[in-house]
Every structure is written in C-alpha cells, then in structure tokens.
C-alpha cells in the first residue's frame, strides 16, 4: 500500500445529541472535539439520531424539531420558486 494516501482509521466516540447515548466504533471521520471515556481520549462525533433514539428501533413515535422548514423556504423563495416552475 502507498504511504500517506489512506485516511486515518481509528476509534471514535459517536454521541447521540437527542438522548446523550455514546458508543465507540472505528471510523475515518475528522473531528475537532475530543472526549475522555473509560480513561482514554477519543475523537468525538456528534450525531442527531442513532439506533438508541430512532423511532424504527425504539418503537416510539418521536417528533423532531424540524417543522417549519418548508414554510420558511416558501416564505423566502415562494414567489420566485413558483414562478420558475410555472414556465
């Protein structure tokens, strides 16, 4: 294998921001934050949803705080977006 062309494959902590669940896995993700877990320092990757919080795996319906994005887009670009689609 050529040296210096492969990404750094290492242990990384992923933290589910919706419930605080953390798990360690191997990844090439680049992060700026670190966390100490079990006496060892790991890079920290923050994620919005994991198997611990996703409704498919938990069996519970959960409302995400994403409502209103379409309305904001329509308010901001509604006239221009609908005008181009009509042509």
Swiss-Prot record:
GO CC annotation terms, alphabetical: ribonucleoprotein complex; ribosome
Highest taxon of the lineage: Bacteria
SUPFAM superfamilies, sorted: L28p-like (SSF143800)
GO biological process: translation
Keyword Ribonucleoprotein part of the UniProt annotation: yes
Keywords carried by this UniProt record: Ribonucleoprotein, Ribosomal protein
Molecular function terms, GO-annotated: structural constituent of ribosome
Family: Belongs to the bacterial ribosomal protein bL31 family. Type B subfamily.
Record text on subunit structure and interactions: Part of the 50S ribosomal subunit.
PANTHER family: 50S RIBOSOMAL PROTEIN L31, CHLOROPLASTIC, LARGE RIBOSOMAL SUBUNIT PROTEIN BL31C
This protein's name: Large ribosomal subunit protein bL31B
Source organism per UniProt: Burkholderia thailandensis (strain ATCC 700388 / DSM 13276 / CCUG 48851 / CIP 106301 / E264)
Taxonomic lineage: Bacteria, Pseudomonadati, Pseudomonadota, Betaproteobacteria, Burkholderiales
Encoding gene, per UniProt annotation: rpmE2
């Amino acid at each position: 294998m050529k040296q210096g062309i492969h990404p750094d494959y290492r242990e990384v902590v992923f933290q589910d921001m919706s419930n605080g669940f953390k798990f360690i896995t191997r990844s090439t993700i680049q992060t700026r934050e670190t966390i100490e877990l079990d006496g060892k320092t790991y890079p920290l990757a923050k994620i919005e949803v994991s198997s611990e919080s996703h409704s498919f795996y938990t069996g519970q319906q959960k409302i995400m705080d994403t409502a209103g994005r379409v309305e904001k887009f329509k308010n901001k670009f509604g006239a221009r977006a609908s005008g181009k689609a009509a042509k």
